[in-house]
């Protein structure tokens, strides 16, 4: 019989940042005896999870995709946001052959160029500056029919902040003398990632048929009407923007459709509705043969043009484990399963040799403030069983609660979420110690520690740019190093496991064995 393994466990408490101020801080307000005791009695440090330290622009808040890529890569990975900013600044973007090719083909055939994406300055799934650059590219290349389909944010930005962005684009189109915003809809519909196809269908119909529940002459009028219906940006219902005398912006065969989101997880479903011949999420009322361009690759099995294909990462933590014949488990709920698998593996969809995966279904509720504990009890049960199984050299687990409940902006629910996590951490730490394993507890970015925006007084539903905790639980006598970042975690784990760190990993171990 094989020797029982003593696992190195990484628990990622999604959205669990560190903030000294107590006001509007769900983590401080929650009763967390377990985390308090670990912080007081175990080796610990604070690490950076935002901005330049994770390959984002300076002071840009972190997010789950970026966080997990850096965690798994063991090096700073320059994100699509930063890469695109640079390309636009030096004008390489305006010569991108995939983007220019799609625009030119549509223009030469007298067809429309449709641009869609999350119109947001949040920088998590997209950035409105990139969308503006795409509008300029289409106009510069002589396209006459340019239609922008704006997905509204209110999640990575304040809940009612879309008006200034929409005005900026209205002014741009007026200055160009061509093109217009053709539709607005909340990301709740257009950017679902949990197979809630009834939501996606509403966005698809709006785009393909130019039909929605509402119509307005201007974007601001459409937005104000939504606010009057008590819909924040995220939840704005399908609204056609079309003044009298303006042509219909329904999509037709041969049109170009450029999707300007750079983050994959919430871009996949609506992309599949356009691209997959065998799509069965809902019965499409109109199937259009558009020239579809993904800004980045949303999934390897989506067969359509990609403007910025992924740069491959060699010797990520998962790949290095496989090369060294180690066994590993990835486990999370639906909401963060892609993060501990695809993103942690550097954008690789397939599992590595010796890598098992467990997916726990997230609860089917409209918003997670209705069930702040989410599926954490079942997740913990499965995680504890895996720790005690003796099968795994390493286990990577993500608890989504701090982030998903933090996004609702409901303080009371976020406190409950954090308290549920404290019980989970207790069970996990006990299990790890009972088998002589090691445990690192950290987060990928902040969220729940800031539940109200002090400037506006509105609920703070976005991530933060604050540091996150890192705690060591285990039998090794270790000393914490200050000044770490997410990309130091993989080298830290390898070091604690007594393994060589591959040269591609430029991060440094944050716990030194004394």
Swiss-Prot record:
Lineage, broadest ranks: Bacteria, Pseudomonadati, Pseudomonadota, Gammaproteobacteria, Enterobacterales
GO molecular function, one term: phosphoglycerate mutase activity
Residues annotated as binding Mn(2+) 2: 14, 64, 444-445
Pfam families, per the entry: iPGM_N (PF06415), Metalloenzyme (PF01676)
Cofactor info, note text: Binds 2 manganese ions per subunit.
EC number assigned by the record: 5.4.2.12
Protein name: 2,3-bisphosphoglycerate-independent phosphoglycerate mutase
Catalytic activity: (2R)-2-phosphoglycerate = (2R)-3-phosphoglycerate
Organism: Escherichia coli O6:H1 (strain CFT073 / ATCC 700928 / UPEC)
Residues binding substrate, per UniProt: 125, 155-156, 187, 193, 263-266, 336
Statement: the UniProt record of this protein carries the keyword Membrane: no
GO cellular component: cytosol
Any one Gene Ontology BP term: glycolytic process
Pathway the protein contributes to: Carbohydrate degradation; glycolysis; pyruvate from D-glyceraldehyde 3-phosphate: step 3/5
């Amino acid at each position: 019989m094989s020797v029982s393994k003593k696992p190195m466990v990484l628990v990622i408490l999604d959205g669990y940042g560190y903030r000294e101020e107590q006001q509007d801080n769900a983590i401080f307000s929650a009763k967390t005896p377990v985390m308090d005791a670990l912080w007081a009695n175990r080796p610990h440090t604070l690490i950076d999870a935002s901005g330049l330290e994770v390959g984002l622009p300076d002071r840009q808040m972190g997010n789950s995709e970026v966080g997990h890529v850096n965690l798994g890569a063991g090096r700073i990975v320059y994100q699509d946001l930063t890469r695109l900013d640079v390309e636009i600044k030096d004008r390489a973007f305006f010569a991108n052959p995939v983007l220019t090719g799609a625009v030119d083909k549509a223009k030469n055939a007298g067809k429309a160029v449709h641009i869609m994406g999350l119109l947001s300055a949040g920088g998590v799934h997209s950035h409105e500056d990139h969308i503006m650059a795409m509008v300029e590219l289409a106009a510069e290349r002589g396209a006459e029919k340019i239609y922008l389909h704006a997905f509204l944010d209110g999640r990575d930005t304040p809940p009612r902040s879309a008006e200034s962005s929409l005005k900026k684009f209205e002014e741009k189109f007026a200055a160009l003398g061509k093109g217009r915003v053709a539709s607005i809809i909340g990301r709740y519909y257009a950017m679902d990632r949990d197979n809630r196809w009834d939501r996606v269908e509403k966005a698809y119909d709006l785009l393909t048929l130019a039909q929605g529940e509402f119509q307005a002459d201007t974007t601001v009028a459409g937005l104000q009407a939504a606010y009057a219906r008590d819909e924040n940006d995220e939840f704005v219902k399908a609204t056609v923007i079309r003044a009298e005398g303006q042509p219909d912006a329904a999509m037709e065969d041969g049109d170009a459709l450029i999707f300007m989101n750079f983050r994959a997880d919430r871009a996949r479903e609506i992309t599949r509705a356009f691209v997959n011949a065998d799509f069965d999420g809902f019965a499409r009322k109109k199937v259009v043969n558009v020239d579809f361009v993904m800004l980045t690759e949303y999934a390897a099995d989506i067969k359509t043009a990609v403007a910025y294909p992924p740069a491959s990462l060699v010797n990520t933590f998962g790949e290095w484990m496989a090369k060294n014949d180690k066994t590993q488990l990835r486990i999370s709920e639906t909401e963060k399963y892609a993060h501990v698998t695809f993103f942690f593996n550097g954008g690789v969809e397939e599992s590595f040799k010796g890598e098992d995966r467990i997916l726990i279904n997230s609860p089917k509720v409209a918003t997670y403030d209705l069930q702040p504990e989410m599926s954490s009890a079942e997740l913990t049960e499965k995680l504890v069983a895996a720790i005690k199984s003796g099968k795994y050299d390493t286990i990577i687990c993500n608890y989504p609660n701090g982030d998903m409940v933090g996004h609702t902006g409901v303080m009371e629910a976020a406190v409950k979420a954090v308290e549920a996590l404290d019980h989970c951490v207790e069970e996990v730490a006990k299990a790890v110690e009972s088998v002589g394993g090691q445990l690192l507890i950290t987060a990928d970015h902040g969220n729940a520690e800031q539940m109200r925006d002090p400037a506006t007084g509105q609920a703070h539903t976005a991530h933060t740019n604050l540091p996150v905790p890192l705690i060591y639980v285990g039998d090794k006598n270790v000393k914490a190093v200050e000044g770490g970042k997410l990309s130091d975690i993989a080298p830290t784990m390898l070091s604690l496991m007594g393994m060589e760190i591959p040269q591609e990993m430029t991060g440094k171990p944050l716990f030194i064995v004394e």
